[in-house]
Structures are given as C-alpha cells and as structure tokens.
Amino acid sequence: VISYIMKFRKYDWDKWKNVEVGDRLLIDLKFSNGFATVKPIRSISKGNDTPFKPSEALTKQTILLFDIEIFKHDSLFIFRDYFTKEWFIINNDLDELRKFYLEYRDSMFIGYNNASYDNNVMRGYLQGKNAYQMSKTIIESDNRGLVYKMFDSHKTPLFGMDLYQDNKGFSLKEHSAFLGINIKETEVDFDMDRPLTDEEKEKNVAYCMNDVLATEKRFEQNIGMLLAKATIALMFDMDKTDLLQTNANLTAKLLGATKQEVRPDLTDPLELDKRLNINTKEIAEAYLNHEFELNEDGKLNVSLEYTDEDGYTMIFGSGGVHGAKASYIHIGMFPMRDWGSLYPNTMEQFNLLSRNIPKDKIHRYGDLLKQRMDAKYSGEEVANIKGVEVPTYVMINGIKLPLNTKFGATGAQFNGLYDPRNQFLVCATGQLIMTNMYELIKGKAQFIQSNTDAHAYIPNSEADDKAIDEALDEFANKIGLTLDKDMFREIWQKDVNNYIAVQPNGKVKVKGAIGLTGGMKVSKAIVSNAFINYLVAGKDYKDFINECNELRQFQIITKTGWTFDRTVARDSEGNEFNAQKVNRVFAVKDKTNAVELLSLIHI
C-alpha cells in the first residue's frame, strides 16, 4: 500500500514522524465517504528494501482555473486547464468530482475568493457533507474561522492561489467589466427550493464558465504575484500550500513570527536617534519627549499641520508626511529626491522590526534587503535559487513581496508580526527622516511637494542645487539609507495625491484617480486619457475623443454597495426594472433612450 502523509498537517505528522521508509506496520484502515484514513498501531519490523519511489508524479499536475455554483438541490463545479484550455464540467455528480480530485489533487487550483469559499465548500462536499449547508453557513456567518473548524474541511488538501487576495479592492465582476468582457449575472435564484430545470442548468453552466474565463484573465494580469510567492516558497523551503496564504501571513511564516500580547511600552516616548537632527520646534514637540496618545480606534497617532514662513504646508499623520502646492503647474527641470524602500530600510537600520520575530530568524529580513539590492545591480539575467534557475527580475519581485508586506503586517491585529508600537515607530522615524531632509533643503529651494518618502523642489540656483545634493548624500550615508534623484521637466499638480509629471526622456508619471489605478480601472477612461494627452502631448481633447473607436474607453462601470438591497433602472418614461449589481454604462445624446440607475434600501 502506498500512503501519502501530509507533513503540513501536524495531527497526521505526529502519528507518522517516527516511521521510517520501508517499515512494516500494523495499521488501522478505515474508509469514509470514499477516502481512506490510515492510523499506524505499531511497527512489525524494519524493511530491508526501500519501496519503489516513482520518478514521475502519480497524479496530473497543471494549473486549473475554477468556480463553483451551489444551490439547495444542485451543485456545479467547473474547471479549465490553463495550458490545454480543456473544460471539465461536473454537474450534480459527487463520484465524478471525487475521481477528478484524485486525478488532479497535485494541481494548482486558482479561483477568486476561493480561499474562504470555493475551496472549503468543495472540500466538504468531497467528504460527503451538504454543499448547500456549507455554502450558506460560510456566506452568512460572522465567524468564518469557527465555520471552517466546525466543518473540518481542511482534512482534504487543496493547493492553489486566491486572486481575491490581491484584488485592488475590486470584485471579479468589476475586473470583468474593466476588461471589457461579459458581466451578465445569473438569472437563476440560488435559494429556490427545487431542482434546477434543464434550461436553468444550461444558464448556470454558461454563467459559471464566464466567471472561470474572467478568473483566467485576472490570473494573467496577476501572474507576477504567483511567481513572487513561488520564489519565496523556494527560497525558504516552504510547502506549496503556502501559496494560498495572504502576503502578510506568508511573510510572518518565513520570518518565524508568532503572535504576542501587546507590550506595556505601547505609548512610551520616542527617543530621537543620534543620527537625526530635528530643529523645527513644532515637529520636535509633536514626536519627542512625551508619551503618545491613542486615538478613538485605540491606535497610536500623531496629527500635526505645519506651515513654514514661506507658506509651505506639510501634514503629519499615521499615513506619513504629505505636502504640496495646490493647483500648481511648473514647466522646467526640477529634481525629486526619494528614499529607496524607506520603511523596509528604516526597520532594518533603526532596529524596528517586529519584536515577535525570533532571534535566530531576525537576520532574514536584512538578508533579503541585501539580496534584492545585489540582484538589482548584478547585471545578471538569471539567478540560481537552490539549483533552480529563474529570471533575475522574478527573484527581485519575489523578494519585494515580504519586504513591502512586513510594515503593514506589523499593524495587522491577527498576524504573527503584530507589534503596534514598532509599526508606529517606523512611521514616526520615517517622518523625522523626512523632516531632517526638509531642513537640509529649506532656504535653498522652493518645495513643490512632499510625500511619504520624497521631496520635490526647485533649487534657487545651481550652487544651491549642488549644496543640497552634498548635504543629502552625507545624511543618507549617515543613516544607512539610499537616496535616489529623479529629474522631471514639467508637472501638473492638483495636490500631493493627484498629479502628472514628465521626465526628460518623455516618461510620464501619473498619480491619483486620473491614472485609472495603473491602467487597470478602465472606467471613464476616455476622459482621463484625453486629459493626459492634452497636457503631455498637446493633443486637442476633442480630436482625441472623436478619433477613439474603442468602445471600452467610453464605458462607465458602476457597482451597488453592500449596504443596498438591490439596483433598479428607470427609463425616460418612469418605468422601473431590476438591474445588476455591477453595470456597464454609456452616455447617450438622446435623452429618450437614457436610463437612470438607482440603488435601493428596503425600510
């Protein structure tokens, strides 16, 4: 008998950890709902010959995009092989689903919100549990962790990735709308108390297949995240099941962090590091030589609005320091000096990593920072990770994942890295670094903007520009951080969070809603693109709009929030009909053809 023991399941591993390959055992073998449970009773003898170990996987290994639809009397599971594009449609057939699972259980199952919903419903259904009952309980429960324990669905291993974990705040239907693909919602009532008709089953299959195709498109947009997680798993000998973890939990695991109670020094005063020099009285008083207060949410916070004698205002808060000349335009060369990975390097250089990381693993974060910088400037196209060759850029992006996730995870209450004081001190120290930097520039330049990790300014003269660079470079060396210098030739600025800046080589930097979330949020895109092209290229916005023949550029994507019960559309004559939660809307010139969308709450 060949039995697979899942080492990542502590309960199983404790029973098998002292058993050697080749041992002859007396076992207790039970079958439940088509699955075997093997419990070792005692060892009969040690084996002389090591059993045959297959050189190839005994099951199929591929990437499967999938989605499920669960009704009271029907269940639908649809899978699509990413490489062969083959569909697998399993409708009301538990035995067929079990065969499929056993054949593909070593494959990667990729869905949208599958970590909390689809995976657990499918696992429970494979074990013979009521799929509808599990579905309703997961959807309606306020304590999903308790639900998962109650159904014990993790007994059936499932490997994969949840695209919802990096969804940029959008639902799958919204992503589908942005991509210009079908967003039609199902017309079949999930709570009907009867089996589906053949026609309803066909509609349900079509709806589900469409969601799988949308998941595939989103996967292709986000494949870098899978590669990043796989890189980290390879570097730290992690199990492939860890790919399903959130970035924050994955980071906590590789750093060996375990949850601790909040320490009693939470509000203790901040002692200014000897490498920093703060002369601005108001800022020094806000951060130094007193205990900190907790805000109404029980979190540490400093709130300060500081305006200097030149009228330049900077706002200090839990999100960093921000300042900008409002409604400002500048045509002409100017520098933006920004810190390389300010928070990650501040944590390392100022000893502000989470105190939940054990001493024997605390070096890992600094090692990753160094590895990333070495790889970035190595000039090598390929990196070797434990005998596996990967493109260097893939390794760099993989290392960025824990480096950039660590700060946020330190403030996540249920994460192993949770250390609210040190998270606050990272932010506060970063703001003091920015203040020290501001003081070195002040008097020698006019400030354009200040954000979390950068100051943009116009030097008063070439001599002042040189003096600023010398002072800033000396300061950067003193605190052990890297300070970059990017040049720009023009900027159009609404505020610090909304601006368009152009570099000498013509590369455009867009910040804020006008940038359509990095080009992902294709809603009212024609307005944003016409505006950017008018400013940057001098293109007449009317010509730009009239020359555009891509319908998707004109779409307006709307979504009814969860606080509303339903969406209705009202035509020009006042007639109302139900609309979808997510809708694709277009402007029309003829008002008689127009409809109005309304979100309703039942009172």
Range-by-range predicted roles:
Residues 167-172, 180-182, 187-199, 310-436, ...:
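Helical catalytic core of nucleic-acid polymerases
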Residues 79, 83-174, 207:
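Conserved DEDDh/DEDDy metal-dependent 3′-5′ exonuclease domain
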Residues 57-80, 343:
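Gly/Thr-rich phosphate-binding beta-strand-loop-beta motif of the actin/hexokinase/Hsp70
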